[in-house]
Each structure stands twice: as structure tokens, then as C-alpha cells.
Amino acid sequence: MLQCRPAQEFSFGPRALKDALVSTDAALQQLYVSAFSPAERLFLAEAYNPQRTLFCTLLIRTGFDWLLSRPEAPEDFQTFHASLQHRKPRLARKHIYLQPIDLSEEPVGSSLLHQLCSCTEAFFLGLRVKCLPSVAAASIRCSSRPSRDSDRLQLHTDGILSFLKNNKPGDALCVLGLTLSDLYPHEAWSFTFSKFLPGHEVGVCSFARFSGEFPKSGPSAPDLALVEAAADGPEAPLQDRGWALCFSALGMVQCCKVTCHELCHLLGLGNCRWLRCLMQGALSLDEALRRPLDLCPICLRKLQHVLGFRLIERYQRLYTWTQAVVGTWPSQEAGEPSVWEDTPPASADSGMCCESDSEPGTSVSEPLTPDAGSHTFASGPEEGLSYLAASEAPLPPGGPAEAIKEHERWLAMCIQALQREVAEEDLVQVDRAVDALDRWEMFTGQLPATRQDPPSSRDSVGLRKVLGDKFSSLRRKLSARKLARAESAPRPWDGEES
């Protein structure tokens, strides 16, 4: 049984966090100064300010956390900026397309899509979000299988990604498929929340694990043909064939999280290892639920560089959206299952793993790589981590509504900080204090080089002599023992002959 231990902080230190945000390159430092006002720079300085109050240090709760299980070099702004050089023409497009898959126009589906569009337009301020008409999974002709942990039907991600790539609108910056069906990327994996196709700006994410209650009766095995090939008769969305959906306000926020996380990947942002951030990867549902709804300052600078928004305007839009969610979305009733209660933690007999996107596939014909924010369960330890029991995420005090109101209060604090009158001297004081600190050791994502000492003939000869004498002594002792045993052993045939 796993022992419960307090979470431990994970940090690269203030100096490294400052370099990750501002950069060590003189041109990028000048770009930072010109892109942000003094108030914005002091706000972003929360990334490396040891006295920060708005952004939190990463916590490690188990030895199986994503941070420890997927070691790799963290992506700072300079690395991100260099990766954008070949993406400039595509960034001129201003439309994000959401492609519902088997999401009918019933109240639950339409309300969810409306909230997703509103959240996405606030999160990616400056881009227009268009929701395409829902398509049936049967028309996509993607592979499918029965779920291993329920009677639901799972859709294979590769067929969906191929469909999205081939039907991508000409003015699309990116296209994201949305489905309430469970997804799986490989036969050996139990499920995944999301996956994207690098180089083509298409991805897909599933909300099946975030619904207030899992489907009580999903399509059975004979229904597989409805998805693997187009049916002769009228096509019915999956919800109409047994899906019982109930999204609480908190469950809807989880859907927004995975949607914005995946769209950030499609805009070029990598996974985050700096502070608590939406762009953290996750190897368990518990880690996915613990991710915040917004970006850390380092990832926020990346997104601002791509879209060019003012920070306060973005936070004001997000604040307005959060107020609307609290006021209009159905609250969790007493006794009603929630995403926190209905979704069990991973049991000890499920191996959990997640592939890194450090080696992405570049075409549909090549092996596709789930992003490091996708959450996959392997049926065998050879797919990644062996066995893991994830702790259940605790329900925030006051229930799901209080958790959303807490985020609303955090957004209000961000707006207040950005409205403050800030002098350059305030920034200089923070920078001077951080620059005076010692630099911490920083993991580079590469194994340390093997140490090679200069050759020394004297040391080599002496070592060989010592080892040779030692082995000769052991050989003599073993020979003496064998001889003594042979002489003292009884020989029954001598008695028989006499």
C-alpha cells in the first residue's frame, strides 16, 4: 500500500525562471521590453519573484508524477521563438475551428459547445472561433472497439485526425475535433484524452471522462460496424444510442481545460515545467484535474507573442466568461455525481503512461504521437510506467461552485495587479534581488557525459598488479579447498572391495 507523503516543491530557481521568461538573448530581451508595459512586466515577473502571490510553484506528489516520469528539457521563450520561424505564414490566419463529432444539438451538447466557444475566444483573444456542424463518427470511418473498463464504444484517434486534416478549411489556423466518445491511440492503451498531428495543426480531444456520470448503457459490440463503416440507414449520434450525459459547471470547466491545452499545442506551445500551468502534461486523471485553467507567465508570454493581445484585456474577457459560467451553468445538486466523485482514481492494476511529443509524427502514415498532455493508460508495463495508484483529487472546500469562484477571484487579482501604476524602479528592484541569487542546477534533458580521466600508465599498471594479485590469491584458496574436500570425502567402494 502506498504511503501518503506531503507534496514537495519542484523549481528551477528564480534565476532560471527569469531567463526562461525574459531570455538571455539581447534581441529577445529588447522584444520583451517593447511588447509589455511596466505594469505587465511586473506582473509577468511573478514567474521569478521569490515573493510571488499569483502563481504557484510546481508540486510533486508521487514518484510517478509526469514531471519525474517524463524528464526532458523545459521549453523557455527563446526555444519557443526559434521554433516559430517556419510557422509564420500560418499564423496570419485568424480562425480556430471546432469540429464536434457525434455532438447533437440537444440542450447539453449545444450548451457545452457554446461555453467552449466563449471560453476559447476569451483565452485566445484576437482569434475568431467557429463551430462546424457536427459529424457522425460513422461518416468518418474511423476504427473503434469496446472500452476495456466499461460498455462504452471507443474511437481510434488516427482516423479522426486523418479526417480533420483532409477536411481542414482553407482559412483555418487550426482545427480541433471534440467528442463525448472515449478515445484510444493504440491497441495497447486503454484511453487518451487528446492527441494532435504535428505539422498539420489538427487535433482531437475527448470529454467522456469529464461528464458528470459515465454512460449507463453505451453501444455494444455489434454496434462497432456503425462506426467502422457508414450505415445504410440514417446515422444517429452516439448520445442517441445510450449516452446519459450530465455536465456540472466544474465538469464543463474540465472540458475547457483540455480544449485550451490542445489548442495551445496546435499554436506551437510545448509542455510546461516551470510553474503550475495549464500546459503541464499528465499521466493520470488526478493530474489532469489538478491543472489550473490558465497559463503561467512564461507560457503566457509565448501566447501573447503569437496573438499580440494586451494582458489586462484577456483577463477581463476570461473574468466575464467565468462570471457567466457561475451564473448560468447548472450547479451541482446535493447527491448528484460530479466529475470529482464519479471518476475513480486509477487502480493499482492499471499501468499509466504517456508518450512524449519530442519525436512527433509528421504524417498520418507515420506513427502518431499523443502530446504530453494526453493521458493514456497502458495495458502492460512495456508501454511506459509500471503500476501506479493515483490519489483521488480532493473536492475543494465549498464544492465545485466554490472552485470556480476561486478562479474568478484569482482573475480579479490579476486584473487589479495589471491596473497598478508601476515605475521602472519597481522592476529594477525585483531584477536586482533575483540577479544577486545563486543560480540553481538546471536539468537539461540530456544524460551527463561520461567522465574520461587522462590516461596514466603508472596508475594502469598498478591497478592491473593489484587485481592480478587478488585474483591469484582467490584462485589458490579455492584450489586448496577443493583438494581438502576431495581427500576427506568418504569412498564407499573401498569398503565393498575389502
Swiss-Prot record:
Region (Disordered): 332-381
Gene3D superfamilies: Collagenase (Catalytic Domain) (3.40.390.10)
CDD domains xref list: Peptidase_M54
EC number: 3.4.-.-
Source domain of life: Eukaryota
Biological processes, Gene Ontology terms: proteolysis
Annotated family: Belongs to the peptidase M54 family.
PANTHER family associated with the record: ARCHAEMETZINCIN-1, ARCHAEMETZINCIN-2-RELATED
Function per UniProt: Probable zinc metalloprotease.
Name of this chain's protein: Archaemetzincin-1
GN (gene name): AMZ1
